[in-house]
From Swiss-Prot:
Protein's organism: Mus musculus
Protein name: Epithelial membrane protein 2
The protein's role, per its UniProt record: Functions as a key regulator of cell membrane composition by regulating protein surface expression. Also, plays a role in regulation of processes including cell migration, cell proliferation, cell contraction and cell adhesion. Regulates transepithelial migration of neutrophils into the alveolar lumen, potentially via mediation of cell surface expression of adhesion markers and lipid raft formation. Negatively regulates caveolae formation by reducing CAV1 expression and CAV1 amount by increasing lysosomal degradation.
GO molecular function: integrin binding; kinase binding
Similarity section: Belongs to the PMP-22/EMP/MP20 family.
Gene null: resulting phenotype: Knockout mice show a longer time to achieve pregnancy and a reduced litter size as a result of viable knockout embryos. Increase in fibrin deposition throughout the decidua basalis and junctional zones in placentas. Reduced placental vasculogenesis at 9.5dpc and altered vascular organization is evident at 12.5 dpc. Increased collagen deposition in placentas including around the placental labyrinth at 16.5 dpc. Increase in Hif1a expression in placental decidual leukocytes at 9.5 and 12.5 dpc, expression returns to normal by 16.5 dpc.
InterPro entries named among the record's database cross-references: EMP-2, PMP-22/EMP/MP20-like, PMP22/EMP/MP20/Claudin, PMP22_EMP_MP20
Localization terms from the record: Golgi apparatus membrane; Cell membrane; Apical cell membrane; Membrane raft
GO terms for cellular component: apical part of cell; apical plasma membrane; cell surface; cytoplasm; Golgi apparatus; Golgi membrane; membrane raft; nucleus
Glycosylated position list: N44, N47
Length: 172
Protein backbone atom coordinates (compact mmCIF):
# COMPACT_ATOMS: atom_id res chain seq x y z
CA UNK A 1 0.00 0.00 0.00
CA UNK A 2 2.83 2.38 0.80
CA UNK A 3 4.40 1.78 -2.62
CA UNK A 4 1.09 2.54 -4.37
CA UNK A 5 0.68 5.71 -2.31
CA UNK A 6 4.22 6.85 -3.16
CA UNK A 7 3.61 6.14 -6.85
CA UNK A 8 0.38 8.17 -6.86
CA UNK A 9 2.03 11.10 -5.09
CA UNK A 10 5.01 11.10 -7.48
CA UNK A 11 2.67 10.77 -10.48
CA UNK A 12 0.63 13.75 -9.31
CA UNK A 13 3.73 15.88 -8.67
CA UNK A 14 5.07 15.03 -12.14
CA UNK A 15 1.71 15.98 -13.67
CA UNK A 16 1.75 19.32 -11.89
CA UNK A 17 5.37 19.97 -12.88
CA UNK A 18 4.49 19.29 -16.52
CA UNK A 19 1.65 21.79 -16.27
CA UNK A 20 3.94 24.44 -14.78
CA UNK A 21 6.60 23.92 -17.46
CA UNK A 22 4.16 23.91 -20.36
CA UNK A 23 2.40 27.04 -19.12
CA UNK A 24 5.50 29.08 -18.28
CA UNK A 25 8.16 28.11 -20.81
CA UNK A 26 8.56 29.83 -24.19
CA UNK A 27 8.33 26.88 -26.58
CA UNK A 28 4.82 26.30 -27.90
CA UNK A 29 5.90 27.15 -31.47
CA UNK A 30 9.61 26.95 -32.30
CA UNK A 31 12.06 27.16 -35.18
CA UNK A 32 15.79 27.54 -35.73
CA UNK A 33 16.05 31.12 -34.47
CA UNK A 34 12.71 31.88 -32.84
CA UNK A 35 10.20 30.70 -30.28
CA UNK A 36 6.68 31.67 -29.33
CA UNK A 37 4.40 30.77 -26.49
CA UNK A 38 1.32 31.97 -24.70
CA UNK A 39 3.00 35.12 -23.39
CA UNK A 40 5.63 36.35 -25.88
CA UNK A 41 7.29 35.93 -29.26
CA UNK A 42 11.10 35.82 -29.44
CA UNK A 43 12.76 36.26 -32.85
CA UNK A 44 16.17 35.54 -31.34
CA UNK A 45 17.50 35.05 -27.84
CA UNK A 46 17.45 38.79 -27.06
CA UNK A 47 14.51 40.20 -29.06
CA UNK A 48 11.30 39.20 -27.28
CA UNK A 49 7.91 40.90 -27.59
CA UNK A 50 5.22 40.47 -24.97
CA UNK A 51 1.96 39.95 -26.85
CA UNK A 52 -0.16 41.75 -24.24
CA UNK A 53 1.90 44.96 -24.50
CA UNK A 54 1.17 45.58 -28.19
CA UNK A 55 -1.18 48.53 -28.77
CA UNK A 56 -2.36 50.67 -31.63
CA UNK A 57 -1.84 49.41 -35.18
CA UNK A 58 0.47 46.60 -33.97
CA UNK A 59 -2.10 45.28 -31.50
CA UNK A 60 -2.20 41.51 -31.31
CA UNK A 61 -5.14 40.30 -33.40
CA UNK A 62 -7.02 37.47 -31.78
CA UNK A 63 -5.63 38.22 -28.33
CA UNK A 64 -8.84 36.91 -26.78
CA UNK A 65 -8.03 33.47 -28.21
CA UNK A 66 -4.59 33.59 -26.63
CA UNK A 67 -6.11 34.78 -23.35
CA UNK A 68 -8.45 31.78 -23.39
CA UNK A 69 -5.46 29.45 -23.75
CA UNK A 70 -3.57 31.33 -21.02
CA UNK A 71 -6.55 31.18 -18.67
CA UNK A 72 -7.24 27.48 -19.15
CA UNK A 73 -3.59 26.53 -18.71
CA UNK A 74 -3.28 28.63 -15.55
CA UNK A 75 -6.55 27.23 -14.22
CA UNK A 76 -5.43 23.66 -14.91
CA UNK A 77 -2.20 24.24 -13.00
CA UNK A 78 -4.04 25.77 -10.05
CA UNK A 79 -6.62 22.98 -10.01
CA UNK A 80 -3.88 20.35 -10.05
CA UNK A 81 -2.19 22.00 -7.05
CA UNK A 82 -5.51 22.25 -5.18
CA UNK A 83 -6.26 18.63 -6.00
CA UNK A 84 -2.94 17.56 -4.50
CA UNK A 85 -3.60 19.50 -1.30
CA UNK A 86 -7.08 18.03 -1.02
CA UNK A 87 -5.63 14.56 -1.56
CA UNK A 88 -3.23 15.10 1.34
CA UNK A 89 -6.09 16.33 3.54
CA UNK A 90 -8.31 13.42 2.55
CA UNK A 91 -5.46 11.01 3.19
CA UNK A 92 -5.63 11.90 6.88
CA UNK A 93 -9.34 12.75 7.21
CA UNK A 94 -11.22 10.08 5.22
CA UNK A 95 -12.59 7.01 6.92
CA UNK A 96 -11.25 3.63 5.92
CA UNK A 97 -12.79 2.31 2.69
CA UNK A 98 -13.91 5.69 1.32
CA UNK A 99 -12.87 6.93 -2.12
CA UNK A 100 -10.97 10.11 -3.02
CA UNK A 101 -13.88 11.45 -5.08
CA UNK A 102 -13.32 15.18 -4.48
CA UNK A 103 -9.65 14.88 -5.41
CA UNK A 104 -10.61 12.95 -8.52
CA UNK A 105 -13.20 15.51 -9.63
CA UNK A 106 -10.79 18.43 -9.24
CA UNK A 107 -8.00 16.55 -11.04
CA UNK A 108 -10.36 15.68 -13.90
CA UNK A 109 -11.37 19.35 -14.12
CA UNK A 110 -7.66 20.17 -14.42
CA UNK A 111 -7.45 17.59 -17.18
CA UNK A 112 -10.39 19.19 -18.97
CA UNK A 113 -8.78 22.65 -18.76
CA UNK A 114 -5.52 21.39 -20.27
CA UNK A 115 -7.43 19.71 -23.07
CA UNK A 116 -9.40 22.87 -23.81
CA UNK A 117 -6.32 25.12 -23.78
CA UNK A 118 -4.18 22.86 -25.96
CA UNK A 119 -7.09 22.23 -28.34
CA UNK A 120 -7.77 25.94 -28.78
CA UNK A 121 -4.09 26.57 -29.51
CA UNK A 122 -3.97 23.65 -31.94
CA UNK A 123 -7.02 24.89 -33.80
CA UNK A 124 -6.28 28.63 -33.85
CA UNK A 125 -2.47 28.74 -34.18
CA UNK A 126 -2.43 29.19 -37.94
CA UNK A 127 -5.08 31.92 -37.82
CA UNK A 128 -3.18 33.76 -35.09
CA UNK A 129 0.02 33.65 -37.12
CA UNK A 130 -1.72 34.88 -40.28
CA UNK A 131 -3.54 37.70 -38.47
CA UNK A 132 -0.30 38.90 -36.83
CA UNK A 133 2.12 38.67 -39.75
CA UNK A 134 4.27 41.56 -38.48
CA UNK A 135 4.93 39.69 -35.26
CA UNK A 136 5.08 36.16 -36.69
CA UNK A 137 6.84 36.87 -40.01
CA UNK A 138 9.80 34.62 -39.13
CA UNK A 139 7.67 31.98 -37.47
CA UNK A 140 5.87 30.48 -40.47
CA UNK A 141 8.36 27.63 -40.93
CA UNK A 142 8.24 26.33 -37.39
CA UNK A 143 6.81 23.39 -35.55
CA UNK A 144 5.14 22.68 -32.25
CA UNK A 145 7.64 22.95 -29.42
CA UNK A 146 8.20 20.88 -26.34
CA UNK A 147 5.95 23.03 -24.14
CA UNK A 148 3.03 22.28 -26.42
CA UNK A 149 3.88 18.57 -26.36
CA UNK A 150 4.24 18.68 -22.56
CA UNK A 151 0.77 20.21 -22.34
CA UNK A 152 -0.68 17.17 -24.13
CA UNK A 153 1.40 14.81 -21.99
CA UNK A 154 0.12 16.65 -18.90
CA UNK A 155 -3.40 16.12 -20.22
CA UNK A 156 -2.83 12.36 -20.31
CA UNK A 157 -1.14 12.35 -16.90
CA UNK A 158 -3.88 14.38 -15.21
CA UNK A 159 -6.53 12.16 -16.80
CA UNK A 160 -4.83 8.98 -15.55
CA UNK A 161 -4.27 10.57 -12.15
CA UNK A 162 -7.93 11.58 -11.91
CA UNK A 163 -9.01 8.04 -12.74
CA UNK A 164 -6.58 6.60 -10.18
CA UNK A 165 -8.07 8.82 -7.47
CA UNK A 166 -11.58 7.72 -8.50
CA UNK A 167 -10.67 4.03 -8.13
CA UNK A 168 -8.45 4.39 -5.05
CA UNK A 169 -9.90 3.59 -1.63
CA UNK A 170 -8.37 4.58 1.67
CA UNK A 171 -6.86 1.65 3.51
CA UNK A 172 -5.07 1.27 6.81
Amino acid sequence: MLVILAFIIVFHIVSTALLFISTIDNAWWVGDSFSADLWRVCTNSTNCTEINELTGPEAFEGYSVMQAVQATMILSTILSCISFLIFLLQLFRLKQGERFVLTSIIQLMSCLCVMIGASIYTDRRQDLHQQNRKLYYLLQEGSYGYSFILAWVAFAFTFISGLMYMILRKRK
